[in-house]
């Protein structure tokens, strides 16, 4: 009995790295998704509405980035997003764009579109190396 439990634990330890993390397939899927988002977002409204999806992709990609890469993109994100608070405490990885679902002045709309283009470009460069 003790040997079977030990064997089971060993098997779980060997298998668990394959179940966790960001796989090559997920990375490829996100890379294609970023390219599609950038390619099909032709007007300001679609860019603003799809910014949150780019933020979600960045959140999934974050563990695979170097601290320098992560810091560079996070500085830009913090300028253009609001922190999600749950009971007054920041949510883990919880940021949302400031711009979705709001009526924006032309200046704010320009900022939102610029943020979309900056974030999309940064993600695209990360995927293409």
Swiss-Prot record:
The keyword Secreted applies. A humoral factor that may play a role in stress tolerance. It comes from the Eukaryota. Belongs to the Turandot family. Keywords: Immunity, Innate immunity, Secreted, Signal. Induction: By a variety of stressful conditions including bacterial infection, heat shock and exposure to ultraviolet light. This is Protein Turandot C. Pfam families: Turandot. The lineage of its organism: Eukaryota, Metazoa, Ecdysozoa, Arthropoda, Hexapoda. It is found in: Secreted. GO terms for biological process: cellular response to heat; cellular response to UV; innate immune response; response to bacterium; response to heat; response to oxidative stress; response to UV. One of its GO terms (cellular component) is extracellular space. InterPro entries: Turandot. The keyword Secreted applies. Transmembrane segments: none annotated. Residues 1-21 form the signal peptide.
